[in-house]
């Protein structure tokens, strides 16, 4: 049974570890998930391992990551949602979310994002959060606006080679 450090009504938040390659492959091996994350739209096995190691490294250094999230009723991997340090801005983090396709449209994105925002502002005392999305990812745009993020223009995102609509959410 997986241990969770944070829960919502339906979601358990855990931490990635080196034994999670199979789970990472379930998520980042799905082209519907990765098509908005990188320029090729597909993660190789090496890309998946690199991504998993990046998340583990972020946890080791900062005690945060894009945490693996699980459906509490089934313990099935939904995807990941969390935060990472954002550039050199003090006390500012980037919110990120990747969900397996079978969990799209069920409210998990909003539920998980709200928990990550609450954690950022109340536990970490973040001043603000940054978020961006692929220009063609309309669902992410709708989610960020629903969560209260404000548009700040577009920022270049090297993994896709595109300028991504970008947003900030201030901690009031």
Q: Where would I find each of the regions flagged by the language model?
A:
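Acyl-donor (CoA/ACP) binding surface of acyl/acetyltransferases
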Residues: 1-36, 66, 70-172
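Juxtamembrane/interface motifs at transmembrane-helix termini
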Residues: 43-47, 55-57, 70-71, 98-100
């Amino acid at each position: 049974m997986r241990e969770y450090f944070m829960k919502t009504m339906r979601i358990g938040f855990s931490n990635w570890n080196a034994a999670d390659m199979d789970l990472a492959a379930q998520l980042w091996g799905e082209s519907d998930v990765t098509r908005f994350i990188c320029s090729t739209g597909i993660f190789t096995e090496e890309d998946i391992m690199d991504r998993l190691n990046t998340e583990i490294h972020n946890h080791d250094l900062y005690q945060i990551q894009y945490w693996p999230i699980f459906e509490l009723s089934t313990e099935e991997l939904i995807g990941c949602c969390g935060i990472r340090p954002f550039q050199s801005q003090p006390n500012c983090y980037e919110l990120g979310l990747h969900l397996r396709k079978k969990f799209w449209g069920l409210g998990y994105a909003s539920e998980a994002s709200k928990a990550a925002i609450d954690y950022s502002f109340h536990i970490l005392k973040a001043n603000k959060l940054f978020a961006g999305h692929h220009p063609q990812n309309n669902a992410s745009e709708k989610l960020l606006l629903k969560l209260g993020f404000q548009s700040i223009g577009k920022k270049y995102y090297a993994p896709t080679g595109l300028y991504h609509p970008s947003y900030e959410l201030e901690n009031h």
